Amino acid sequence: CIVAFTMIGPFAWMVSASFKLNTEIFEYPIRWIPKVFHMDNYDKVWHSIAFPTYFMNTLKLAVIITVLQLFTCSLAAYAFTKLKFSGRDLIFLAYLATMMVPWHAIMIPQFLVVRTLGLYNTHASLILMQAFSAFGVFILRQNMLSIPDSLHEAAKIDGCSTFGIYAKIILPLTRSGLAILTVLTFNNVWNDYMGPMIYLDSDNLKT
């Protein structure tokens, strides 16, 4: 209970403060339930900025990037797990090593590439940069390793194509991994602050 309150406490205070006047927010002792519920703060947020536009842009990016990551990461994880090709494990390790590179180290080169390609101030810049994830491939690969190779071989003997095995057998058996990646990716894109600040300039595109 103590841990749960510690986690929920700040969120509850934030909701409570949203209904208070500025002078009431930091009063001591904390009044969790406001004396009077003021809706002015919500009215100001809704009308002082283009909140509906920002909200829809954020939702659009979060949904598109999440769907793309699920597709690209699951395909890559399937290849790294069930397909046999030269240098498979080495390529996976090299791809995984990209997680060790801080985003701040590639921020400027990334921006220069985006500008050179003419993608600056477009949602496509954010979508393309986040459509692939080494972390997502790692999660799904670990999940797919638990699927017996005999199941994959049996499907091949029955005449199922490689993509058919991926779509009809592998994906249904990795629902738990896909669910985890969905939540993590959506949450990460929804909370992304730096990306839109760097690559978007028009108010109608901001999140």
Locate each region found by the language model:
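A hydrophobic, multi-pass inner-membrane permease signature
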Residues: 1-207
